């Protein structure tokens, strides 16, 4: 659901940054060349990829099949979190399956999408969440955990995140930046 809804929302929201009224503008020899150069210069590869996916799922041919189904899944996820928060105030879990990735990791777009898996549910549910550094792994890269709370209970999430960060004493910077 996330990989349908997020690109659809990105496509819709970023459509106004056309270089004519908003955002970066790169002049071309005609209007079409201006659009092409502006979009090429103004958005990175991942943003462009998500905009293309989003435009496709919002098309009349795909809207009911993909977007509306994803919206139903989003509602189910939100309902599940609401049920969970009847039993507790906050949920703490890892931010990802491992450490942060080195900047030069060379991961494919699909591998980068997989890194989001631990964070997509709360984004879909519309609940506050905060990722907090909680130490460095033996490879020198940071580890993180995230705190999630009820909808509009942002302050409680931030208070626990601040406490975790102070207790974890993560005052070290990562020893590995570029995979070295």
Could you say what each language-model-derived stretch is?
Residues 1-11, 16, 20, 136:
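Gly/Ser-rich, acidic/histidine-flanked active-site/gating loops
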Residues 27-37, 71-79, 111-113:
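Short gly/ser/thr-rich secondary-structure transition/capping motifs
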Residues 2, 29-31, 65, 69, ...:
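Short, surface-exposed loop/helix-turn segments at secondary-structure junctions
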Residues 48-79, 87, 124-180:
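Structural helix-boundary/capping segments
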Residues 23-51:
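Glycine-rich phosphate/pyrophosphate-binding loop
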Residues 19-20, 57-59, 96-99:
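Short glycine-rich anion-binding loops that position phosphate/pyrophosphate groups of nucleotides
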